[in-house]
Amino acid sequence: MKTKFKHILVILCLSMISCEGNLEPELFDQITPENFLTNEDDVKTAVTGVYAEFRGISEWGRYKTSWGSVMTLQEVPTDLWAANWFYKAHTDFMWKATDYFVCEIFEFFVPAITKATALIARIQDAPVSDDIKNRYIAELRVVRALWMYDLFDLYGPVPAITDPEKILNPTQDFTVTRPSREEYITFVENELKEGINDKILPVAWTGSDYGHVSQATAMMVLLQLYMHEGGYCRNKHVGDYLDYFKKAEQVAKDIMDLQYYELQAEFKDIWSPQNQHNNEIIFALPSFPIPVMGNNFLAHVLPTDYKSQQGIPLTGWNGFRTPWEVYDSFD
């Protein structure tokens, strides 16, 4: 009896060892090309990760009113905006490469462009429908072009990687070089034109898709690009600046011909709490009362003794403001 029991025990042990040898463990805490981008939800999640680059990982967002954001770097040196705490060198446009607040946008968005480029290629190979592929690839191309324009406005042509092969299969001798102004502008212009002409993206998004780029977003950035280059050619006495301004005028007419967007009837309504999702806004980064997703604009602009209409004191840092000359120009 003991011998029979031992034989059964040995057989069971061998069976268990044999089964374990054929097991292939499924790892749920690791993302690989084999287990991700296999369905529509994966694609949406990955694209959301690219949109997250607009914000970063802190309350001091890259496109908010934070010091060193795209918004402040583009507006504070102009005569449209002033700041109570900016270094004079910033407001006078005397920037240095050693200044972190000047350089951080470059450090944020050059890698973000690489991220978008790689995802475009991966979505092309994903086992999802063509409609899903076309929509999200179109969005990523417009997002990438938007970032490339803003970087161009701040730093000139930057060494952005737009060839996915250089990212997914890099060689040891690959180096990123700064493109010529013409090459850079042509790429951004073509990406935006395709985002408009392909008609894949809608004129505007609503509902849960509000905050995604659209045809009108591509038009908006293209208009900025043409105005930028028209001003550059006029100031540098190079090229045909009038040609750029004519192109800008046409894009502006195209936006109006969409018959969707319009300016607020009253200038003061721009600041109204009731103006959310109004049709003056072409592209928005929605804010929510949760960490990282908030909007600290009010705190930046309100005076320190400000109280709401209900008499409640609100946080005010007395920082950014618009000169009275600008405000009065809207009367």
Q: What are the residue ranges of the model-derived segments?
A:
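Bacterial Sec-dependent N-terminal signal peptides
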Residues: 1-29
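Secondary-structure transition into beta-strands, especially the periplasmic turns and strand N-termini
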Residues: 4-9, 125-141, 246-254
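An aromatic- and glycine-enriched ligand-binding surface/loop that stacks and positions planar moieties
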Residues: 20-83, 162, 185, 193-200, ...
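Short linear capping/connector segments at secondary-structure termini
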Residues: 29-32, 97, 163-171
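Conserved, well-structured interaction surfaces
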Residues: 44-48, 52-58, 81-155, 174-186, ...
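Short, flexible active-site-proximal loops enriched in glycine and acidic residues
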Residues: 155-161
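Solvent-exposed loop/turn segments at secondary-structure junctions
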Residues: 158, 166-168, 288-290
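Short helix/strand-bridging catalytic loops that position acidic/His residues to coordinate divalent metals
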Residues: 169-176, 207, 236-240
